[in-house]
């Protein structure tokens, strides 16, 4: 019997949950024996507006053409890209969420005092071992907590030297050493640490530039960055500001890939992350990485291309007034790693090439979607009933 899969999520919105849902759906089309349907979830705020141009045009046509569930469609599995423990009408349900501080929001708990109360038909899908701990602590049985990482599109996210040089020229950074970070500029991203570390290395590296990419359409990224700069000591702010470039507009997948290619070094000194997809994407482009050690990125980085910042566990206040887990990266160690990268420019380019090969072998969307299918349809896979279409030729 073919597997029937209902995916519930968002389309054509520049949010990580939407990007992941759509990327998986594109890859799921390879499976001739999965009947795939897509149901749009309402947006959490009227400020969100759909827009095209995020994915490649051919991919967006395929996403738009995903059929909704017809009358009488009874899924074997429902994959919902929203934290919700309510049971499905039929079959099994996998609820996707990324509790970045390893504590579940009141909305996700939605009346359940512990995981022991969550119906057995409800499973959890989450992208890292770090976030999985949040569900295990809540009491969800380990056999119903499934870790499937995110992936990259190798058509776009791979080393491309000609493109790298062109984008650097367009950005006016042809001769600079470009240190880059991408994210919402929220408190968990560690942008204050990055600014302070950059101030420390700025005088000794006159060609270093710090390039930050925010998301002004979904978050107050520019305002947060401005407040963070204002909070710096005046001497540090004077060193950083002339060397800092900020870009907040929405990018398509192709534009984002080009932007990442322009970097010499990608830095993510985060305090708490559910996954941190830009780290994976930068590495896929051949950019060496510095990121917080001990967190979600440990799952998909390797010492051959990523330097991990020493960190210590901390407690973090949540937006809903609770307490969760975080990591405090060591500022001195981050500064030391930045100086090492600046002093070893050819060596870190070789690290970047190693990282691109490592990611391409393990973390394409097709590869991680195959892992997803094994989790969603474990019973059917055991019987050998499911499999992707054979490649043409």
Question: For each predicted feature, which ranges?
Answer:
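N-terminal pre-catalytic "stem/leader" segment of glycosyltransferase-like enzymes
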Residues: 1-73
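Conserved donor-binding/catalytic core segment of Leloir-type glycosyltransferases
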Residues: 6, 173-189, 195-198, 210-212
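Extended catalytic core of nucleotide-activated donor transferases of GT-like folds
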Residues: 45-139, 255
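Acidic anion/phosphate-binding donor-loop and adjacent secondary structure
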Residues: 136, 152-170
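Nucleotide-activated donor-binding/catalytic signature segment of Leloir-type glycosyltransferases, i.e.
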Residues: 222-254
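Aromatic "clamp/platform" in nucleotide-sugar-dependent glycosyltransferases that forms part
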Residues: 271
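A short, well-ordered alpha-helix in the C-terminal region of glycosyltransferases
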Residues: 340, 347-361
């Amino acid at each position: 019997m073919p597997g029937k899969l209902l995916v519930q999520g968002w389309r054509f919105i520049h949010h990580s949950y939407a990007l992941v849902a759509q990327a998986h759906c594109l890859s799921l089309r390879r499976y001739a024996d999965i009947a795939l349907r897509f149901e749009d979830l309402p947006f959490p705020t009227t400020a969100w507006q759909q827009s095209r141009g995020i994915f490649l045009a051919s991919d967006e046509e395929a996403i738009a053409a995903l059929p909704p569930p017809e009358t009488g469609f009874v899924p074997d599995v429902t994959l919902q890209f929203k934290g919700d423990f309510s049971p499905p009408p039929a079959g099994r349900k996998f609820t996707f969420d990324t509790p970045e501080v390893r504590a579940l929001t009141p909305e996700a708990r939605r009346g359940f005092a512990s995981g022991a109360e969550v119906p057995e038909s409800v499973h959890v899908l989450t992208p890292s071992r770090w976030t999985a701990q949040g569900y295990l602590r809540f009491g969800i049985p380990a056999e119903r907590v499934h870790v499937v990482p995110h992936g990259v599109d190798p058509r776009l996210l791979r080393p491309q030297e000609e493109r790298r040089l062109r984008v650097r020229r367009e950005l006016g950074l042809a001769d600079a050493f470009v240190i880059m970070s991408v994210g919402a500029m929220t408190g968990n991203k560690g942008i204050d640490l990055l600014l302070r570390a950059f101030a420390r290395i700025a005088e000794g590296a006159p060609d270093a530039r710090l390039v930050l990419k925010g998301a002004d359409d979904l978050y107050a990224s520019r305002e947060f960055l401005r407040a963070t700069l204002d909070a710096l000591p005046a001497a540090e702010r004077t060193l950083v500001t002339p060397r800092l470039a900020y870009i907040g507009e929405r990018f398509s997948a192709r534009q984002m890939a080009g932007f990442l290619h322009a970097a010499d070094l990608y830095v993510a000194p985060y305090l708490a992350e559910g996954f941190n997809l830009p780290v994976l994407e930068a590495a896929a482009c051949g950019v060496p990485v510095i990121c917080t050690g001990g967190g979600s990125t440990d799952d998909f980085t390797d010492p051959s291309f990523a330097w991990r910042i020493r960190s210590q566990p901390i407690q973090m206040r949540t937006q809903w007034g609770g307490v969760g887990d975080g990591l405090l990266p060591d500022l001195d160690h981050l500064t030391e790693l930045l100086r090492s990268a600046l002093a070893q420019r050819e060596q870190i380019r070789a690290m970047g090439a190693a990282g691109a090969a490592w990611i391409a072998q393990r973390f394409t969307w097709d590869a991680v979607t195959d892992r997803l299918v094994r989790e969603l349809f474990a019973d059917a896979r055991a019987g050998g009933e499911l499999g992707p279409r054979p490649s043409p030729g």
